[in-house]
Amino acid sequence: MSPASGDVIGRLVILKAWESCEKEIMGKFLRETSFLDAYDFSFIPVGYNLGFEHNFLKRRAEVHGLPDIDILSKPFIDLRVIGILMKGGEFKGSGLNKITGKERDGMMVPVWNKVGDYDKIVEYVEMEAREFVRFNVWLYSRFPSLFIEWKKTWDY
């Protein structure tokens, strides 16, 4: 993602568990990203409700005997707090599917996986990524002026 605009720089890569295995996919993620670099800012996770991904990745890495994947131990950007604030401080109704054009939550993904409906999983991931990026770009374009407005309230 562009640090200037919040827009995508490359193409979306979907690592598909049904074409490989979970351990192999997680290993590929670790090899092909700078996640394990000692420099804290080499890989900055950006997402919505990163606690969900954190818990999943941490547990699955442990199960597979992979290096610890702790996406919350270094700098990260989680837009969930913005969604909560936009909903007046309420957690309820602050999911990405409630504040963007994302049509549904991810509850059906395990079902689709179990019955082999992989095209629906890919469509879901693409929709989620598209709506997240659209929201992220929108925030990047508006927050600088919000900061300027806020700065005008400073008394010093």
Predicted regions and their residues:
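Conserved RNase H-like, two-metal-ion catalytic cores of nucleic-acid enzymes
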Residues: 1-36
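Metal-dependent phosphoesterase core characteristic of DEDDh/y 3'-5' exonuclease domains
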Residues: 6-11, 39-156
